[in-house]
């Protein structure tokens, strides 16, 4: 999650040139009775921080493990196999339950996106990770079926790390595409696909890989080749399953002409706190930026789902930039200027926000809902946290800041 939008900004200059010729804003994928039509509207939420840990979503787990635990790799290495398995099993069994899926459905969602790491299905020698996640993913599929929700299974971490972020399992240098890491990723993906794609009444899509970081050094040509391999795996197992492809921090239009008409959906992510310009905006600026992004993705020749976004406009949340890393907003990160004061907003509830903060958050969320439904919808990041109000859909819904019903608008026509 770190630097997501700022890295997108790095490539903005060349994204506007050399693009494919103009195409309709929506192209058709074949509709099938047993699956979801991704030419329609996805309304859903990510189950983040559950089967792949992130320090800012569950800071207590990482804080209790000591300073060295900054991602799932170092957490499990610090705790050791036995203690790590005990800690994670307790987390997996309590953080998300069937009741969460019922709440998500009752709020009007039709999808959940569930991140999973390669280590859950394909352990490699000399790695500290523990497994056991698949039992809970199995439960989640059953819970989704009972709740009437569709599932996107998201391969969130690859061997070597595809982005260098803690949400890949291991932060630091990007080593994916080195050695055997791509073939190892394909093997892990195939294991997931063989286990879950036959349940096509619920698992209607699977994501090839979350946020491969092209600006950070991932080869675009190599990524396209990997995507071709993944599509072949899916078609061999279940030709009716749609494949989500990350834009790799490029524009969705830069992927025009690639696998168009092959039941693929572009996944793009939009955050406004990981970029020095965006974090400086007032609420009017944030609304305009979200609306502009919605117009930008309309140029894709494939369905586009904004697969991650939030109601946050600062990086004040504890550990958001990484455990022990400071904030841009307060001018403490990478020689930033100061844009404001985090005050008591590093952790807490939506109920703790001021009236103005709740109003601004609601306005920003509504703008994004309208913008992203101009194409093919959205998946909010994330359902639940230990106290990150701009990111916690469950808490936002409970406090009337996330629209309920989803079409309710206190600030209509912001993107008109």
From Swiss-Prot:
Glycans are attached at residue 344. Beta-glucanases participate in the metabolism of beta-glucan, the main structural component of the cell wall. It could also function biosynthetically as a transglycosylase. It is found in: Secreted. Disulfide bonds join 291-415, 316-342. One of its GO terms (biological process) is cell wall organization. Keywords: Carbohydrate metabolism, Cell wall biogenesis/degradation, Disulfide bond, Glycoprotein, Glycosidase, Hydrolase, Manganese, Metal-binding, Polysaccharide degradation, Secreted, Signal. One of its GO terms (molecular function) is glucan exo-1,3-beta-glucosidase activity. The keyword Thylakoid does not apply. Its cofactor is Mn(2+). This is Probable glucan 1,3-beta-glucosidase A. It catalyses: Successive hydrolysis of beta-D-glucose units from the non-reducing ends of (1->3)-beta-D-glucans, releasing alpha-glucose. GO terms for cellular component: cell surface; extracellular region. Its main location: secreted. InterPro entries: Glyco_hydro_5, Glycoside_hydrolase_SF, Glycosyl_hydrolase_5. The active site is at residues 211, 308. Monomer. Belongs to the glycosyl hydrolase 5 (cellulase A) family. Its EC number is 3.2.1.58. Residues 1-22 form the signal peptide.
